[in-house]
Amino acid sequence: STHKKTLDAINRYNDWPYIQKSIRPIIQAGHTHVHMDLIVGLPHEDFNRFGQSFNDLFSLQPHALQIGFLKLLKGSGVRRMREYKYVADPLAPYEILSTHVLPYDDVRFLKYFEDVFERFYNSERFRTTFGYIGQQLIHGETDAFTYFCDMTRAWLKEGNHKVNLKDIDQI
């Protein structure tokens, strides 16, 4: 997350301007594969705030931007934080299903979002295309999160989430 209130709640320090300044030249040099992670379900991060963190990380154009889902592992500090009203799958890996600011329907949509983003951006199969689109999203009127949300909605509308993985190239 790049949200200070979220980071404070989980006792993490993040100097975002310093991170940007440090990571951007590494990515631009092209000699090192940069993989960044973003977690769904952290405290105080609703759908829109998650989108802002996504846009912040996407603006760096990492080689991979992995979207994960908070897991409430037994004994973890975040599992004991009752004020965030976590609802999690009772079976391992104990992924969150909803939080105090992120309802189930948003978590479910973000699962589909993650799948679409993984297939199209992280797969690197469309690296040239998304290199161009990425620049438009960073500097244009539509932000990356909105673009990939729209792409996810279209994906769902067309029923592509039901397509067998081996048949995905036919879409």
Model-inferred region functions:
Residues 1-91, 97-102:
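Conserved non-cysteine loop/helix-boundary elements of the Radical SAM core domain that shape
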Residues 4, 110, 165-168:
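Intrinsically disordered, low-complexity regions
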Residues 26, 68, 89-95, 108-112, ...:
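Aromatic-residue detector
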Residues 92-128:
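C-terminal accessory region of radical SAM enzymes
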Residues 115-171:
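Radical SAM enzyme core and accessory elements
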